[in-house]
C-alpha cells in the first residue's frame, strides 16, 4: 500500500525516473493557513546536489499544487501536489543486472518483471520529496498548537555527536572517496505533544511512528527513548518516576521516550532511526544477470548519496509530523487541533 494514516491519509506515487512523483494529503483541517515559502525551505533541506556529502542529482522540487489550497488556506479537500523529475539519467542503469541489497530482485519476483526500477523506481529515496511536502503541511498545523519537531544526526559510522560534526563529515567523505558508503543514526525529538495521544496495540504511538519511519528507504532500525539500551538495565534503573510540578504530573526521567503503553505521557517524544549504508556503491560486487541467469560482477554507476543521513533529517521530521498529527486527530487532543 502507498497510503499511510487513519484520520490524516498520505498517499505517495510515482517512480524515480518517471515523468514525476506526487502526493495527496487527505484529512487536513479546513481553514489552516499554509506558508508555501516555509514549505519550500523544508523541500530545499532534502534536495540533492547541495554539497559533497550528497548525490549530485539536481532537482528543484518546486511543488505544483493541484488542489486543497486556496488563497493560502486549506479548503478541506485533499491537498495534491506534483513534482517533475528533471535530472534523471536512466542510461546509468542496466535492469538485467541485479544491484545487491536493492529491491531489483525482490521487486522482479513480486511484480513479474513489470516494475520500472530505473533509479530504484518506486523504492527510491527520490519519493521522500513527497513525504517532506506532506510533513511540511502537517508541521505548520502542529506548530500552531505548540508542537515542535527537530532531528539531528547522532552517528555516522564510528563517529558520534549531537549533530553532524567534522568527524562525521570525514566518515562520509572517506567513504565516498573509496567508492563506498557509510551507515548512520538520526535522533528526532518532538515536544509539546499533550499526554493522552495514541492508543492500544496497533494504534499505539510506537506502532504508528515505526510504520511510517520504515517507509523511508534505507531505514533498518527504530528505537524509542533508551531503546535497545533498556535491555542492559534493571527496572529500578529504567523506570521513569512520576512527580508533581506546578500541579502537573511529570516524569523525573525520560527513558521511555515520552510514551507509556503506546500513549504519550507529556514528556518529549524521543525516537531514533538507523539508516543502512547506501546500497549503491562504486566498488565491485558479485551479482547475477537475471536474463542470462549467469553470475557476474557490478560496479554501480550513477549519482548516489555516500550517506543517507544528511538528506534524511528533514524526511524523518516530516514523517513524525504526519504521524503525530494523525494521532492527535484520533484522540482527545483533537479538541486542540
Predicted regions located by residue number:
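Short acidic, glycine/tyrosine-flanked loop/strand segments centered on an H-E-D-like triad
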Residues: 96-121, 288-304
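Internal helix-turn-beta structural module
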Residues: 9, 81, 278-337
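N-terminal, positively charged regions that mediate nucleic acid binding
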Residues: 1-57
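Glycine-rich, mobile lid/loop segments that gate access to catalytic sites or pores
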Residues: 110-201, 205
